[in-house]
A protein has these predicted regions:
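Extracellular/periplasmic ectodomains of large secreted or surface enzymes and adhesion receptors
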Residues: 21, 27-68, 180, 184, ...
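Short structured motifs
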Residues: 220-226, 270-276, 366-367, 378-380
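Short acidic, flexible loop segments centered on an aromatic residue
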Residues: 246-263, 269-271
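Terminal connector regions
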Residues: 292-335
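Disordered, acidic Ser/Thr/Pro-rich linker "stalks" and the adjacent N-terminal cap
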Residues: 335-389
Length: 391
């Protein structure tokens, strides 16, 4: 839980100790190692399946016996700085060594199982995802990680973390990163089955931004202002989130955008904002995000960062693949946004432009960030003073 990047002479609370400190007096906590982190043939065992040795089978049998005697089994698996770190590329993303054998044997007892992962990289836990009812990703939780994990397992803490990486299902999907470009993670096939042309399983095991909670959340009332902007104007996005469960909890609300039609291929979704909020049961909060012009930029064929006119899809969700709300905004070329507003609402005023905001505290439209197009086509921000003589 500590790795070799920090001081080692610190007091450590293991997961076992955290659970022992949490249970009520008189509760028996059974423990056995179950298996080593890696087996004797590792890393070759990531390519070749070796039979279990008698010693390995004996350790797994002890874990099975303990599980049969217990109300719930907590299986702690993962990796360490031996399997993850600088210059530690692996041939597989599966659980190393005999860890999956141990997990499968404990699950086969029929007792409730909780899997706790302590690891430094995504692991392809496809079998566990299908057959284990509860999985807690702890990463490297630090010296007091055992206490934090026990608090979470016993419900004294409601987890609210979200993945900053993508968990692939297999190494065959790599590179599998977020964001991705259209059709980057599919093979183009439409027909499944033996006679179809689907050659692989698509989609991540767990997508970017994914994470669960002991409560539930509902999203509603998305609004975008203004819906029509120039290439230099920000956009304000508002939405509401309600805790619809019975527990207080944190939700990480994520804002994504997509350029619907562009001159070059762009990402399916770009994360442009997020906010972690705490909500009590039944509580609703309104969130406000700002999409800046730089959030809509692309690198065009001339290697220039530009905001191209057109429609942008705005998405709010609980992960990159759990989108709850959709809307869109439209970017128009500078000057053409007037077609969407009433020309009679504009007043003629004479102004002077200055490159210093401090020299012109009063601005024509009340916005110090108003941008005007320069003669060479670039955008320069000026401060504009009301009622000044033309200069």
């Amino acid at each position: 839980a500590l790795t070799h990047y920090g001081p080692l002479a610190v007091e450590v609370t293991t997961v076992l100790e955290g659970i022992q400190n949490k249970v009520k007096p008189g509760t028996e906590v059974l423990f056995t190692k179950g298996c080593d982190l890696v087996d004797a043939n590792w890393p070759e065992s990531e390519l070749i399946r070796y039979p279990l040795t008698s010693e390995e089978q004996s350790e797994i049998d002890k874990a099975v016996e303990n599980a049969k005697k217990s109300d719930v089994a907590v299986v702690v698996l993962g990796g360490s700085n031996r399997t993850c770190g600088e210059n530690k590329s692996r041939s597989s993303l599966e659980l190393p060594g005999r860890q999956l054998d141990l997990l499968q044997a404990v699950v086969a007892t029929g007792k409730p199982v909780v899997l706790v992962l302590i690891n430094g990289r995504p692991i392809s836990i496809n079998w566990a995802d299908k057959y284990v009812p509860a999985i807690l990703e702890a990463w490297y939780p630090g010296s007091q990680g055992g206490t934090a994990i026990a608090d979470t397992l016993f419900g004294d803490y409601n987890p609210g973390g979200r993945l900053t990486v993508t968990f692939p299902k297999t190494v065959g999907q790599i590179p599998f990163n977020f964001p991705t470009k259209p059709n980057a993670q599919v093979d183009g096939g439409r027909n499944k089955g033996l006679d179809g042309n689907m050659s692989r399983v698509n989609g991540p095991l767990y997508p970017f931004g994914y994470g669960l909670s002991y409560t539930t959340f509902e999203y509603s009332d998305i609004s975008i202002q203004p819906a029509i902007v120039t290439q230099v104007q920000p956009v304000t996005v508002r939405c509401k989130v309600t805790n619809t469960g019975k527990r207080a909890g944190d939700e990480v609300v994520q804002l994504y955008v997509r350029d619907i039609l562009s001159s070059v291929t762009t990402y399916e979704k770009n994360l442009v904002g997020f906010d972690r909020i705490h909500l009590n049961p039944g509580e609703t909060k309104e969130l406000t995000f700002t999409i800046e012009p730089r959030d809509l930029q692309l690198l065009n064929s001339d290697n220039h960062w530009v905001v191209e006119p057109g429609d942008f899809k705005v998405m709010v969700g609980a992960s990159s693949e759990d989108i709850r709300l959709n809307d869109r905004c439209t970017v128009v070329e500078y000057g053409k946004e007037q077609a969407a507003t009433s020309a009679t609402s504009r007043q003629q005023k004479s102004v002077i432009a200055s490159s210093s905001q401090e020299s012109a505290p009063l601005v024509l439209d009340g916005n110090l960030s108003t941008a005007w197009k320069a003669n060479k086509g670039e955008y320069i921000t000026f401060a504009l003073e009301n009622n000044a003589s033309p200069n």
